């Protein structure tokens, strides 16, 4: 029972990081229709930045906060390159984000090398259902809940959120009523970058990161977002938590070597189910 509880709770913690990464993808896609394949790079860049800031004597909390702000700034710059030029299409934006992701690889290797890095998180542990759980996992869960609830309130209850929602629903109509669609797109990239950066900052104390860690994050985040068709944050959260728990169970009872395959199989199953449902609707 103790092992099962440990796998479930740690899986929820890691799943929250996947949900944050996937939520960043959803925000960007809903507003710009661009699939941002540099999303994982935001997470890695911010996590590695924290290691440098802490080594320079910047205190915990401030270092993580500055790194998340950096993620937002890098996200906005990514958006400027991907969609800033008039006439760009979602397809060209996707290609740009792929290229920027490769550039991020090179920068991260140049600045931090290719060895995995980590930094200390919230210390201590608690006993839950007979399992000793690192307190940092509870921090990940709590921060994710607060951030995603805040994001939902932003979209539902503020003028800025309504402008983002209007742009996502119909960019042409948004322009007609005076909404700056490009500004909303850049803001979406900034929010996506901050969410990705937050995911990296939260997960690094329990999972080391290196320049290529973005692959696992973006695969799992994209798999979570696929459950919600890249447009539904609640299903993205559910997908991230499901992936985190299943991967923790697979890693605990079988082997950690199969964890990435879990995300790929999940994505494949969702796509097949969606295609089958579409065929049934068309036949009817």
Kindly give the residue locations of the regions a language model identified.
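Transmembrane helix-bundle core of multi-pass membrane transporters
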Residues: 85-157, 184, 254, 283-284
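Single transmembrane alpha-helix segments in multi-pass membrane proteins
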Residues: 3-55, 78-88, 92, 227-234
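Pore- or pathway-lining transmembrane helices of multi-pass membrane proteins that form conduits
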Residues: 41-42, 79, 84-109, 214-226, ...
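Membrane-interfacial amphipathic/re-entrant helices at transmembrane-helix boundaries
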Residues: 1-21, 49, 58-63, 89-94, ...
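Transmembrane alpha-helical segments in multi-pass inner-membrane proteins
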Residues: 18, 22, 59-69, 189-196, ...
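Alpha-helical transmembrane segments within multi-pass membrane transporters and channels
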Residues: 25, 58-100, 107, 239-243
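Cytosolic-side transmembrane-helix boundaries in multi-pass membrane proteins
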Residues: 24, 88, 111, 169-183, ...
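Helix-loop-helix "hairpin" substructures at the membrane interface of multi-pass membrane proteins
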Residues: 10, 14-15, 132-210, 233-238
């Amino acid at each position: 029972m103790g092992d099962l509880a440990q796998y479930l709770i740690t899986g929820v913690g890691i799943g929250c990081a996947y949900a944050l990464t996937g939520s960043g993808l959803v925000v960007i896609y809903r507003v710009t229709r661009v699939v941002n394949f540099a999303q994982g790079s935001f997470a890695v860049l911010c996590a590695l930045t924290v290691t440098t800031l802490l080594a320079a004597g910047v205190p915990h909390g401030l270092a993580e906060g500055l790194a998340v702000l950096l993620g937002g700034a890098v996200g906005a710059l990514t958006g400027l390159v991907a969609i800033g030029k008039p006439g760009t299409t979602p397809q060209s934006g996707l290609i740009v984000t792929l290229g920027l992701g490769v550039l991020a690889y090179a920068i991260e290797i140049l600045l931090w090398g290719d060895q995995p890095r980590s930094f200390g998180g919230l210390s201590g542990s608690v006993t839950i259902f007979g399992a000793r759980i690192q307190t940092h996992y509870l921090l990940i869960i709590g921060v994710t809940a607060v951030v995603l609830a805040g994001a939902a309130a932003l979209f539902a209850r503020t003028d800025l959120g309504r402008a983002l929602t209007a742009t996502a629903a119909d960019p042409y109509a948004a322009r007609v009523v005076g909404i700056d669609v490009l500004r909303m797109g850049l803001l979406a990239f900034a929010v996506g970058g901050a969410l990705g950066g937050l995911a990296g900052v939260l997960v690094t104390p329990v999972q080391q990161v290196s320049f290529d860690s973005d692959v696992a994050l973006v695969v799992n985040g994209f798999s979570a977002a696929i459950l919600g068709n890249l447009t539904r944050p609640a299903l993205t959260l559910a997908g991230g938590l499901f992936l985190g728990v299943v991967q923790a169970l697979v890693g605990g009872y079988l082997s950690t070597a199969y964890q990435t395959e879990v995300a790929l199989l999940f994505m494949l199953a969702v796509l097949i189910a969606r295609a089958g449902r579409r065929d049934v609707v068309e036949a009817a």
